[in-house]
């Protein structure tokens, strides 16, 4: 009887361990904290002169990922520890604001890129040299784009890079439900995700500026480069 009981207990323990991954994902998806952290916000990230961070929440998301990845070989921590990690997600607005900012900024960059690409450099600087019109464009670039837009884009990059890496790591946890995988792929997957679309839009926009200013010899280091002043 004793060996039979031992075998039954071993089988029961193995059975419970086999369901840990499913239980983990069910609990994570059912939590409002997790859902709210990875959804669109009503407002984008604020424009701030000081650096905005989301370190505590990203660290909590990484820890939740480590817990899921270690299952079923390693048992999860107690409920209080899990609740503390979820609370860190709940206390952060940055992820949802970042998601909204990525969508809005990508759209804005795409529109601005189309305008730049539609500008005929032959009319802007007929002699392939700085002209009065190209100097106006350079003024816009230095005062508006480099002075106001680029700092915000840098803020998105600083906040978004560790966030995207954390989302990608969570996506790799085994036994992820299809719906959850799709949602995370849409946020930071390799193709057609918010993060990748933003990166592509930023690259194209930067290239559009370089092409247009370069055609008028107005890039940094070229003869037409100067630092305009307001007014």
Which role does the model predict for each range below?
Residues 92-231:
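A cross-kingdom marker for long, charged
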């Amino acid at each position: 009887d004793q060996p039979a009981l031992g075998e039954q207990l071993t089988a029961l323990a193995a059975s419970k361990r086999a369901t840990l991954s499913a239980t983990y994902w069910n609990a994570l998806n059912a939590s409002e904290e997790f859902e709210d952290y990875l959804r669109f916000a009503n407002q984008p990230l604020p424009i701030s002169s000081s650096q905005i961070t989301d370190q505590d929440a990203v660290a909590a998301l990484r820890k939740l990922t480590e817990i899921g990845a270690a299952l079923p070989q390693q048992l999860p921590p107690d409920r209080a520890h899990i609740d503390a990690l979820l609370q860190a997600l709940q206390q952060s607005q940055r992820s949802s604001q970042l998601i909204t900012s990525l969508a809005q900024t990508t759209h804005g960059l795409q529109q601005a890129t189309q305008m730049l690409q539609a500008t005929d450099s032959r009319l802007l600087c007929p002699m392939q040299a700085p002209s009065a019109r190209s100097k106006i464009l350079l003024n816009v670039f230095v005062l508006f784009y480099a002075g106001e837009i680029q700092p915000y884009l840098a803020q998105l990059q600083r906040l978004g890079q560790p966030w995207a890496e954390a989302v990608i790591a969570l996506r790799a946890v085994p036994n992820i439900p299809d719906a959850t995988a799709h949602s995370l792929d849409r946020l930071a997957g390799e193709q057609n995700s918010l993060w990748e679309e933003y990166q592509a839009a930023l690259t194209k926009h930067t290239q559009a500026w370089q092409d247009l200013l370069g055609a008028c010899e107005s890039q940094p280091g070229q003869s037409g480069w100067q630092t305009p002043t307001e007014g």
